[in-house]
Amino acid sequence: MLVAGWSAGGNIAAVTCQLARDRGGPDIAGQLLVCPVTDCTFDRPSYNDNATGYFLTRSLMYWFWDLYCSPADRTDPRVSPLRGKVAGLPPAFVVTCEFDPLRDEGVAYAEAMAAAGVPVEHLRASGHFHSSFAMVDVVITGVPGRAQMAGALRRFAGLPEVSRGDESSKGHDSPEHRIAAAAS
């Protein structure tokens, strides 16, 4: 099983990995966390650097947190996974974007997992903002990053990498083949 999530979904994926480890399953082979929400604090530099102007704003994050849970519950690791135990988690591919209020908490989560011995790949997406990877036909600079994410999921699943010109990929029109072709 693999888990993946973007933003709040990244939070859910991270918490799912911690709960699966603590409860003895299910076995998770890898986690893809794209711009994940990992902590309830707003005092990291990226919250000031990217407070406005890049789709996801600091004030919008305040609003989301107020909808999600009470201030008293925010430090619970099931809400803020950065505050939980990160040792023993499955391999991770973490994406953070330069112009994202969540950048620094994503970096902190990737660094905490790596320090605890979790295999971590970290894509620091320069020039990207919180939702730019989802804008497939608009932000074409996201193609290589999306290909890296797909490659990580394939590795976690034990599948071979797909590359343009691979004889086995000729004549196929699956999404992973289109991603590989666009990225090369």
Could you describe each region identified by the protein language model?
Residues M1-S184:
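Alpha/beta-hydrolase superfamily serine-hydrolase fold, recognizing
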